[in-house]
Structures are given as structure tokens and as C-alpha cells.
Amino acid sequence: MSNKPFFYQDPFPLKKDDTEYYLLTSEHVSVAEFEGQEILKVAPEALTLLARQAFHDASFMLRPAHQQQVADILRDPQASENDKYVALQFLRNSDIAAKGVLPTCQDTGTAIIVGKKGQRVWTGGGDEAALARGVYNTYIEDNLRYSQNAALDMYKEVNTGTNLPAQIDLYSVDGDEYKFLCIAKGGGSANKTYLYQETKALLTPGKLKNYLVDKMRTLGTAACPPYHIAFVIGGTSAEANLKTVKLASAKYYDALPTEGNEHGQAFRDIELEKELLLEAQNLGLGAQFGGKYFAHDIRVIRLPRHGASCPVGMGVSCSADRNIKAKINRDGIWIEKLERNPGKYIPEALRQAGEGEAVRVDLNRPMSEILQQLSQYPVSTRLSLNGTIIVGRDIAHAKLKERMDRGEGLPQYIKDHPIYYAGPAKTPEGYASGSLGPTTAGRMDSYVDQLQSQGGSMIMLAKGNRSQQVTDACKKHGGFYLGSIGGPAAVLAQGSIKRLECVEYPELGMEAIWKIEVEDFPAFILVDDKGNDFFQQIQSSQCGAALSNVAALRGGNMIRYFAGERRKRLIRSTPLCCYR
């Protein structure tokens, strides 16, 4: 084996950055000279201001390209009525959030900062602390949510009360600029990050595509589609693969080359991206409740690998696509321009359009009467909820289980009212509630049977598909799971939630148990008391008859199913085993 001469390959060779930025300030930045070279001097205040503004902007606004993709759904004749309904709610939500009061999503995320510091940039040290201060200022001063829990020991936790710590990863590079990518990453989409350890045997055209489609199916709808999906094949290590997944889902690597070389440069496979996007459209899951728009786009990146390893990574950026670039150069501090007027994407005819027909449900009456009313309607039925709802999520359910395990029984409020899986952002002055959208239902699946056996949690409201144990529990105990659109948290806070108060465990912050009063709160029957599961009906390869039955009910509901060749593709491509 002959030795090759040394050659350094930039592992991620990107083309020129064409991102549009605005100038935040030219203060706190100066130019000096050292040993004949110009040095960019950056004061700590510059880093704090940059992080503060970037996370503020990303919490209330999204990229124009993302908003355009959402708007395109409204004009697509192949989009289902559900796709269009969800897209319209996203645009309305963005229009409210862009005012800077109610954030786009109630889960205002973990603050993640990736920084690349040029060798001729001097800060004097303490960069992480200065950036963390900016994150702190954003979450303290804006109406955001504190989602970070600190471990006191292996089992006891406490909310940090600031949303710190942030994840800050800084790298040294050439040049005289300091460049950043800031990500506000919610738990729902973060939890849809996966690593699979495979082998060379996977790397054939027939096997790889089918493999990636199978993995894509497992994402489900819990992380608020339409998604920006990223696949990464290869990597010098597992962690290198997953870091690339995260950045690819944020469009950070869009300017990579489209072919590889013998030195191991990363590249995008554009053709495979197109093929996978078509497969995503044919899954039938759509924008949360059935349709075409499971994904806006897909990125596939190929990396070099060790001969004994073939890591495959998958991740998503959700409908709250909160990614924003920033940079510091000799001219000042620059922040990526996000869309400040998302209302312009809403067609005039839809600006004041009503919400269509829905079954009105009065929640301020005995639970038995509410259950009796819901039992009259099939899965997919659209509802308008009015009255009292209990709000609780992960820790609240753990607390309730502890009570049951001690033989204490359940509090009456969990028996008398539906429970909404959610945790509110801070309430702005003059508002009844902060942004308050649903969290992922599946994390509470293990509690359902025990709760319902004691008369609690008979009606659950959240987002995403659920496991068979929930369907079985609802059939056994006469319960229901209702779906709420994941994403439009500002719309719900402004239009549907009229009062919010803490019922129990105030020390848990957003994880406390709350009570809300709602008007015209939209929901859909997803699992009923007869063992029917809406997602099972649209996903099963054996459910042609069920699809026809549900389609016949579409007059007053939100779901429209497909006919002809598109329906055949949907049925062929969605075996039930892929979803359970």
C-alpha cells in the first residue's frame, strides 16, 4: 500500500452564505492591530446582545422560506382539507406571535448556540458566560417558558427558573468573524432524534431508500408536522453523525456540495431527497391528521465512515422551525432577518374565514354526560370545547400515580374534567394565559389505564398518535383521546383560553397542575370508547373499508381522503406494524 501525500479536506465545504441579515448595532466592536494583522475586538456585551436578540426573534418569528412553504400548502390541489386547515392555523399563529407578546410555541425550548470564532477575533475570554447571559435575559424578559430541570440527585429535580443551562458549543476557525447558529429546540422535536448503528450491507440503492422510509414512518405526528426531516449516513463517530443531523435539520448545511470525493467531504444527495419527500407525501399522515404534508422537505447528507461502522441518524425541525443565524464582524452585530409580517401569506379570502362546522361540547356538566355525547360520534369528528379543563403533563402524572400507589385515590378535579397535556408559557400582562399548546401525548401512555380504572383522565387532550395500550384502556373504561393541533399555541392563548389558575404543585412551575376555562377550543376525536383509533385507520394497509367509511363522514369534519392511484399508494405504503 503506497502512502498518499498529505491533503487537508474541509469536512463541510460550504458555498458562500447568502443569508439576509440586519444590523443590530455597531457598538461593542472595534478593530486593532497586532503583529501586523488586524484584530477584531469583541466586548462581552456584544455576545450578550447577540444571544438576547437572536433568541427573542426566533421565539416570535420564523424564516420567510419556512412561511412560504406553509403558505404553499393552501394552494396545492393535492393537499387534504386537513393539511390546509393546519397550514392556515400555523399562519394565523405566526401572525399573532410576530407581535412579540405570545411566542410561537409554548415550549420555548432549550437554547442551543453553535459558534465559530475566527482566529483573529479577540474577546478576552468568558464567551460562554456572556452568551448564557443573553439567553437568560431573553427568557427572563420575554413571555417565554422555563423548561430546564436541574438534578439535585439521581432522582430529585428542580426547575432552574431561568431556562438555563443553555447548550453552547464553540469552535475555533480561520478568519476575523464570529458566526453563530442559535436554535430554540423544543422537547417534542428533540425527542425525534435517532441513531441507528448499521453496516456496509445497508449501502445499496434498494436497501437504503426502503430503510429510510421505514424509519421516517416511525416519527409519527407527535412532534408537530409538517417536518423538516434530516438523514445523515456515515460519520467518523456516532456523535459526529448526530451533530450533523441537528445542523442539517436547521438548514445549516444546505450549501454543501452534491457529490463526494476521495478525501471525505460531506455532500447532499439531492435525488434521494426528492425520492424520500415523495414517499413522505404518500405515507398518508399529512400535517398531523391525514394528508400529504408530513414533511416540507428532506435533507440527506453522506459522511465518511470507519470501515466497521455505518451510523445512520434521523432528526426533525418541527413546525416551530426556530433556527436563526447571527454574526459579528468589523461592522457590528448582525442577526438573520426573520419574517416580521407572516400575515401577508394568508390569502385575503381566508383572513376572516370561519372555522367550519364542529360539534359543540359543554364541559361544565357531569363527566358521564360528556362521555355519552362523545360516544355518538366517530373518530375524526371535529369538536368545539367549552368549559373547564385541567392542565397537567409529565411530573403531574407522576404525582398522581404516587397518590394511587399509596392508596390515596385521585383528586376530584381529575375525575370531573378533561385533562389537557400542556405546560404554559408566562402570562403576558392583560392576557388570560401565555402560549399554551399541547405537548406530546405518548409520554403519558403508561398512566392511562391506572388513572381511568379509578375514574380519572377519562377525556385526554394532547397532540400526536398514541400506543395500543391507550386504545385498549379507552375501550375498557369508556374513555376518549382528543387531538389538538400541535403548534398554534399563540392562537389558542389569544382566542380560546379565557382563564388560567394553578390548582396544585405551584412549585413545579410549568409542570404544575392548572385549570383553564376555554371557549371554542378546537379538538378532534382520535381514540374513542369503542376501540377505534384514527391514526390506525389511516395507516393500516388493511383499512380500505375504514377509509371509505370515514370519507363518507367528511361533510362536517376536517378530513378528506384520497381516491384513485394516490389512495392505492397510500394503502400500499402504510403497514400497521410500522406504527406500533
From Swiss-Prot:
GO cellular component entries: cytosol
Record EC number: 4.2.1.2, 5.3.2.2
Cofactors, names only: [4Fe-4S] cluster
SUPFAM superfamilies, per database record: FumA C-terminal domain-like
Manner of cofactor binding, per the entry note: Binds 1 [4Fe-4S] cluster per subunit.
Keywords linked to the UniProt accession: 4Fe-4S, Iron, Iron-sulfur, Isomerase, Lyase, Metal-binding, Tricarboxylic acid cycle
Single GO molecular function: fumarate hydratase activity
BP terms from Gene Ontology: tricarboxylic acid cycle
Pathway: Carbohydrate metabolism; tricarboxylic acid cycle; (S)-malate from fumarate: step 1/1
Binding-site residues for [4Fe-4S] cluster, renumbered to this chain: 105, 224, 318
UniProt-listed InterPro entries: Class-I_Fumarase/Tartrate_DH (IPR051208), Fe-S_hydro-lyase_TtdA-typ_cat (IPR004646), Fe-S_hydro-lyase_TtdB-typ_cat (IPR004647), Fe-S_hydroAse_TtdB_cat_sf (IPR036660), Fe_dep_fumarate_hydratase (IPR011167), Fumarate_lyase_CS (IPR020557)
Reactions catalysed, as given in the entry: (S)-malate = fumarate + H2O; oxaloacetate = enol-oxaloacetate
Gene induction: Is expressed under aerobic conditions. Is repressed by glucose and anaerobiosis.
Family annotation (PANTHER family): FUMARATE HYDRATASE CLASS I, AEROBIC, FUMARATE HYDRATASE-RELATED
Functional note: Catalyzes the reversible hydration of fumarate to (S)-malate. Functions as an aerobic enzyme in the direction of malate formation as part of the citric acid cycle. Accounts for about 80% of the fumarase activity when the bacteria grow aerobically. To a lesser extent, also displays D-tartrate dehydratase activity in vitro, but is not able to convert (R)-malate, L-tartrate or meso-tartrate. Can also catalyze the isomerization of enol- to keto-oxaloacetate.
Membership in a protein family: Belongs to the class-I fumarase family.
NCBIfam families recorded: PRK15390.1 (NF011919), PRK15391.1 (NF011920), ttdA_fumA_fumB (TIGR00722), ttdB_fumA_fumB (TIGR00723)
Oligomeric and partner information: Homodimer.
Protein's UniProt name: Fumarate hydratase class I, aerobic
Organism phylogeny: Bacteria, Pseudomonadati, Pseudomonadota, Gammaproteobacteria, Enterobacterales
Gene expressing this chain: fumA
